[in-house]
Amino acid sequence: MNSLVKGISKVRSTRSFSTVSMSPLEPNKKLNYEGIDAKLKQFRLHHNKPLTLAEKIIYGHLEDPSTKVERGITYLKLHPDRVAMQDATAQMAVLQFMSAGLPETAVPTTIHCDHLIEAYKGGEKDLEVAKDINKEVYDFLSTSAKKFGMGFWKPGSGIIHQIVLENYAFPGGLMIGTDSHTPNAGGLGMVAVGVGGADAVDVMAGIPWELKAPKIIGVKLTGSLKGWSSPKDVILRVADILTVKGGTGAIVEYFGSGVESLSCTGMATICNMGAEIGATTSLFPFNKRMVDYLNSTGRSNIANAANSFKHNLVADPNAHYDQLIELNLDTLEPYINGPFTPDLGHPLSKFAESVKTNNWPAELKVGLIGSCTNSSYEDMSRSASVAQQALDKGITAKAKFTITPGSEQIRATIERDGQMKVLEKVGGVVLANACGPCIGQWKREDVPKGEKNSIITSYNRNFTGRNDSNVNTHAFVASPEIVTALTIAGDITFNPMTDFLTDKDGNKFKLTPPTGDELPSRGFDAGENTYQPPSPNGQNINVIVDSESSRLQLLQPFAPWDKKDLVDMQVLIKVQGKCTTDHISMAGPWLKYRGHLDNISNNMLIGAINSENGKANAVLNQFTGEIGPVPTVARDYKKRGVNWIVVGDENYGEGSSREHAALEPRHLGGKAILVKSFARIHETNLKKQGILPLTFANPSDYDKISGDDRISIIGLKDLAPGKQLTLIVKSAKQGSEFEIKANHTMNAGQIEWFKAGSALNYIKSEKAKKN
């Protein structure tokens, strides 16, 4: 036994955790701290080095703890503790799970109805409308949950990540979720990773989940937050430093004395928005604030177990980080990020100058607080303290104001404790416990579509047109306290640290910094019961999908590779600049088709900018000579038997975990995506669906390709891990051809997915062999 193992063995508790449930809602599913401990002990026999916290959790979930691991290189086979899915992505995941022919999920799994509720009139009215128009989907998900042994959170329950934090997250756990902001659970010391539905199906089927061993970025926090600064400002500053792709392939691990000054939900906020820097996930070490939160949410037994296991819930001394960032919270001022990208950071003291310099609209039209990022009790309390100051001076918000509680528990508690009343009095409209405007589910009517305007949110993402489908809406992201202050002022250049407001009598006054309890002194009010527990016996339940439905469609397997090179693929579109999953598969009004692959494919790449003409959703059909919508042209190529390819820029597929952005191109005849670089989740999703995700060996080759060229990929029979591919480009404009090289990151197993036509096809074929 090496010295590290000996040292750690001395502090191990002999206590058994096998009687402690992972969640009060799942009494028969137990913590496996002993199993993690045993695997780490075996892992250390082969790796005599200090480990980061992220490494401890990940390596403690390895299928084979004797695996030799090299960060950024080795593909790990892992066994997560649980799966969480939101209703928009769950539809396709459940349809895929059904086609696998398995009786029940192998790990605890939950479905959360939060994405399909459109914000319009207010919470109760919007919820009733959603229940009516989405009844078919909700019934499908509810029945599927009963049949396959999954927990089901009904519409109105709240946002998936808040529900997970309140009920399921635990220190040292490993979870995957079909939403990019799954890392929210890192606020409770959990490695929680956003994935596509096909990855979720693997885990639900009991198949090891594959993840390339991430690099580790350390963020050392010192000092403590003061005044108007909040946990949100930590991640806004980190995003400003690392940019939207700076965390790609890495886990962001926070540590240092400054951690102790952050609430558990504040740490969750920071981890949540790690998705905006492309990080695999983010997390914090186990500490007293996590214990406080676990105790307040009815999980004292987990807090006690974690305390006995804490040697594996913090990094080893002298653990190595691939990159180190240091932030002094004493001097961190509030940040406002945006517009159009979450990594364009502005210290509050300089923001007004940026607004003036860039000619952004200074008048604030709407302020929106809440979302999965900032809808905790503390967030609502601090925002209400700002609103109360305005009310005390006889004024209300000059801009429109919306409030989204993160869960039914938060809604009921702030209603009981008075924060909701204060926020409503200042002019706020309380929306349903759901995602709403954060994901584009917002029926906005205060400005005409296309009008240049500014909004500010406490959300996480502010891509062009994301919130309201208006490409001229300048969306800025800040803490809920700052959003509330600016909404009262009606001006995005207002700085509450220095500027004055005018009371009802015309007197000037300045807002004092926000205050608010981290947790309710009287405990949480659970509110209405919106939970459907897993059924103990669902074998006799039938899940029916109407063949005439416009919302749901059973999946047909994709065709396997025909063992031939991909010759003369037509470039469907050469994408110019940023191309997020919102550009590839828009949300908003399209969310209702998330369970119907053919219908939702009509939104494929309609937001991407065509480099040939600078327009969105306008590409030249090379056979008809006519300009048409991208999906229409793709369907025509497929009908003609012509394979096609997409050419893109940097960080292609940035944003959400939606696998529809990979399913749609596959469904409409796409064979490969060739770009300068990929966002992690999207690249994996493409592999899962049998599409070749390729990157230029020489990024400047992007400029050599035109939107009307044809591309051949040769030598596919020799496709192997780490081996470059040769592409032949036939230039339509020049009448010549040239050769370029492309890289890929597929390992041997992923190459088998390509050959089988998809990962699901491969799973089914392997299962058939065993039977």
Curated annotation (Swiss-Prot):
Its cofactor is [4Fe-4S] cluster. PROSITE patterns: ACONITASE_1, ACONITASE_2. CDD domains: AcnA_Mitochondrial. InterPro entries: Acnase/IPM_dHydase_lsu_aba_1/3 (IPR015931), Acoase/IPM_deHydtase_lsu_aba (IPR001030), Aconitase/3IPM_dehydase_swvl (IPR015928), Aconitase/IPM_isomerase (IPR050926), Aconitase_4Fe-4S_BS (IPR018136), Aconitase_4Fe-4S_dom (IPR036008), Aconitase_dom2 (IPR015932), Aconitase_mito-like (IPR006248). Keywords: 4Fe-4S, Iron, Iron-sulfur, Lyase, Metal-binding, Mitochondrion, Transit peptide, Tricarboxylic acid cycle. It comes from the Eukaryota. Substrate binds at Q86, D179, S180, H181, R461, R466, R594, S657, R658. Pathway: Carbohydrate metabolism; tricarboxylic acid cycle; isocitrate from oxaloacetate: step 2/2. It catalyses: citrate = D-threo-isocitrate. Transmembrane segments: none annotated. GO terms for biological process: tricarboxylic acid cycle. It holds the Pfam family Aconitase. [4Fe-4S] cluster binds at C372, C435, C438. It is found in: Mitochondrion. SUPFAM superfamilies: Aconitase iron-sulfur domain (SSF53732), LeuD/IlvD-like (SSF52016). Its EC number is 4.2.1.3. GO terms for molecular function: 4 iron, 4 sulfur cluster binding; aconitate hydratase activity; metal ion binding. GO terms for cellular component: cytosol; extracellular matrix; mitochondrion. Binds 1 [4Fe-4S] cluster per subunit. Monomer. Belongs to the aconitase/IPM isomerase family. This is Probable aconitate hydratase, mitochondrial. It comes from Dictyostelium discoideum. The gene is aco2.
